[in-house]
């Protein structure tokens, strides 16, 4: 029963959150929807989830203040350093939360920690390169930045996996859930790489922001009820 609730309920509700965006006619309405629901859930969530919800909203704000991803695709004239730094911090916070979860059960604990450290180091390299390319026309640097953004795709999967099961990080299947979301978001990175026009469509429907925001809603509601589902 618990497995069905974890895999089915959390995943379906997450997907429905994205479906709602399709029916909203303008970008502003989609943005208001994401933030309004987040504020409402944040009011009833516990302090940990309040912080996570605010962090997801902050990530959205960064995308709007420094829009290096636009409806037209990637814009290398905008600063990306703030976004990738935000991604890296979010992944580090997730790793810290999982690492210190009480009675955490991970079948491949050593591999989990090794991969997590490698992912964080890769994301930090991407942060450094994103700073170096500011006002730089060095083609090789821009190429390195582009390919190291795969670690930010990993950080997205890391965040989604942690937020969806935030109240059940000690579940025996968490490791597979974690791997699934990292794989999905990494696949998404490759899709963007080969079909760059999808970046513009994603930005138009606020997908890039919604990925981080919607996954906090389910755990936010549960945290207010102190229920482990």
UniProtKB/Swiss-Prot annotation:
A GO cellular-component term linked to this record: membrane
The keyword Transmembrane appears for this protein: yes
Keywords assigned: Membrane, Transmembrane, Transmembrane helix
Topology with respect to the bilayer: Multi-pass membrane protein
Major localisation: membrane
Keyword check for Transmembrane: yes
Localisation per UniProt entry: Membrane
Chain ranges passing through the membrane: 6-26, 36-56, 80-99, 114-134, 144-164, 174-194, 207-224
Family: Belongs to the mimivirus L68/R809 family.
Record protein name field: Uncharacterized protein R809
Origin species: Acanthamoeba polyphaga mimivirus
Source lineage: Viruses, Varidnaviria, Bamfordvirae, Nucleocytoviricota, Megaviricetes
